[in-house]
Design a protein with these regions (language model features):
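Transmembrane helix-boundary elements of multi-pass transport/secretion proteins
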Residues: 3-4, 10, 17-88, 114-116, ...
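Helix-loop-helix units of permease transmembrane domains in multi-pass membrane transporters
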Residues: 81-113
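Helix-capping/transition residues at the boundaries of transmembrane alpha-helices
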Residues: 21, 94-96, 164-167
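Transmembrane alpha-helix boundary and packing residues in multipass membrane permease domains
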Residues: 41-45, 124, 128, 161, ...
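Transmembrane helix segments
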Residues: 42-50, 164-210
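Residues that define the loop-to-transmembrane-helix transition and helix capping
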Residues: 26-27, 60, 102, 170-171, ...
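Short hydrophobic, aromatic-rich alpha-helical segments embedded in or entering the lipid bilayer
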Residues: 2, 6-14, 191-228, 237
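Alpha-helical transmembrane segments and their short interhelical loops
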Residues: 101, 106-177, 236-240, 244, ...
Length: 282
């Protein structure tokens, strides 16, 4: 019990330090701002475009969907961070210290989740003024936003940790981008999913990105907007069920995969990866 509390305190402290560093480093600050600015630009041009005869504007529909997409992208951020720090030896150093691996993973969750929340705030706050038609006045909206976001992070961050243990180099991380972009394209983020073929709708509903987008739309859009969703409903129970299933899967698989990855780490494996990276640069 004492070892666990030490790991939690060390991980929390490590995560806060990493988070503070990410907002004091010019390159990291730019990366935090770049994506929200790009999305706000897209929303600006969509703000007056209507979806069919529904009377709803694409900009209004897209803002909560993009928030859900960004929450799901925490999975990619976690995967990239683990892969990069595995390659540069950070993971090996954590393994060599008492309670190092649990503390390292807790710290990584804190820093990635904290950065994700900051990015969502950077997008949501100005987005409210860019697009109209949002229903954010009541406490119910913010309560739904909170549980969808928290459950979504629990569902996606462990999967990101699993993916980070699979790839052996930062360069190979590029392999994950194409399927993720494909999932975004079919998950109703920038255009309602009901406009897509039925078989694509079924594929999208198997993954967290669609459900995070749906949950965010249910929190921020008026009730009438559910008319353009599948079954003309926000389907809160289904959202909780699918995200919960992904969370259980990730929490069961991630510790096993990460322990196996940590056992394989050694000074020679880190040196070999560095040598391969230098050969690519040369």
């Amino acid at each position: 019990m004492k070892a666990a509390s030490v790991a939690v305190r060390a991980g929390w402290s490590r995560g806060l330090i990493e988070l503070r560093q990410s907002f004091t480093n010019g390159g990291d600050v730019l990366s935090h701002l770049l994506w929200p600015v790009l999305m706000l630009t897209v929303l600006f041009f969509l703000r007056d475009t209507a979806f069919g005869t529904s009377g709803l504007l694409l900009g209004t529909l897209a803002l909560p969907s993009i928030l859900g997409m960004n929450a799901a992208m925490g999975m990619v951020s976690m995967s990239q961070a683990l892969t990069a720090e595995r390659e540069d030896g950070t993971l090996l150093r954590a393994k060599a210290t008492p309670n190092g691996m649990p503390g390292y993973l807790i710290g990584k969750v804190v820093s990635v989740a904290g950065g994700l929340l900051a990015d969502l705030a950077i997008l949501l706050i100005p987005g409210i003024f860019v697009v109209g038609g949002l229903a954010i006045g009541g406490p119910g909206s913010w309560a739904t936003l909170t549980w969808v976001l928290l459950l979504g992070m629990v569902a996606t961050l462990p999967i990101g940790a699993v993916l980070g243990s699979v790839f052996t180099s930062a360069r190979s991380q590029g392999l994950i981008q194409l399927p993720v972009l494909g999932m975004i394209a079919i998950s109703g983020i920038f255009y309602p999913i009901t406009a897509m073929p039925d078989w694509l709708q079924w594929v999208a509903q198997a993954f967290p990105i669609y459900w995070l987008g749906l949950g965010m739309r249910s929190a921020l859009l008026p009730d009438g907007a559910a008319a353009i969703e599948i079954a003309a409903s926000w389907r809160h129970w289904e959202t909780a069920g699918v995200l919960g299933a992904w969370a259980v899967l990730g929490l069961l698989v991630a510790p096993v995969v990460l322990r196996r990855m940590a056992r394989r780490e050694s000074g020679s494996s880190v040196a070999a990866r560095r040598e391969r990276a230098l050969r690519r640069v040369g």
